Amino acid sequence: MSAPQRRLPVYKKILEENKKKWMIKEFLEYRLSKYGYIDSEILKTPLGTRIVIYAERPSRIIGRKGAIVKEISNILTTKLGVENPQIDVIDISKIEAPEMFPKVVAYRIANAMAKGVRFRRVMFVAIRQLMEAGAKGFEIVVSGKLSTERARFEKQTYGKLYKIGYDAKNRVRRAVVHVLLKPGIYGIEVRIAPATLQYSDEYKIKPPVRPEAVQQQS
């Protein structure tokens, strides 16, 4: 870290660090979106910066003999000033069903539409996959010039899905993906309440436990 950065006030250091994290995430999504990139975590360590990439197809992100990872590491160092980046790629299927990640579902819909598949058919396929995966609730919105020259949207919802409040902001997963087709730009928004999610208003009252009867002494 340079001398001017050391003299920055604490709040400015925090803002600079968050800005750099945002720039790293934006770059990774731009560079790796077509290779199954889902999300990333950026952690500062004594040895440098550890970047954990969650992907649907890790082998495509790593590249042949690690070529893509090396390229990304070089760009992060030279262009974004990341100190000693250490990149790990994790297969999300080992953590949770891929269908529980809205970005996976949104990219599947976008890729199918880019191949000429009708949006309604793609939505129904995604709905079936989400239901089979056990999602607690979900919403899929496709917007654009769907059937006429005027832009509109079509929405499909299922199950219990909160749209406002703490749970909607912090627990319900959301992703937005855009795809450019011949008629124009289409937007795909996916919200998912994963199977393991427990809403704040969901609780169980345990039945009272009766104490064991005290045996009378003879």
Curated annotation (Swiss-Prot):
Function comment: Binds the lower part of the 30S subunit head.
Matches recorded under HAMAP family: Ribosomal_uS3_A
Domain of life: Archaea
Domain KH type-2: 2-71
Gene Ontology CC annotations of this record: cytosolic small ribosomal subunit
PROSITE patterns, alphabetized: KH_TYPE_2
Protein source organism: Pyrobaculum aerophilum (strain ATCC 51768 / DSM 7523 / JCM 9630 / CIP 104966 / NBRC 100827 / IM2)
Gene that specifies this protein: rps3
Pfam family, one: KH_2
The family this protein is said to belong to: Belongs to the universal ribosomal protein uS3 family.
GO molecular function list: rRNA binding; structural constituent of ribosome
Subunit: Part of the 30S ribosomal subunit.
Coiled coil: none
Protein name: Small ribosomal subunit protein uS3
GO biological process, one term: translation
CDD domains the record matches: KH-II_30S_S3_arch
Lineage, uppermost ranks: Archaea, Thermoproteota, Thermoprotei, Thermoproteales, Thermoproteaceae
Keyword entries, A-Z: Ribonucleoprotein, Ribosomal protein, RNA-binding, rRNA-binding
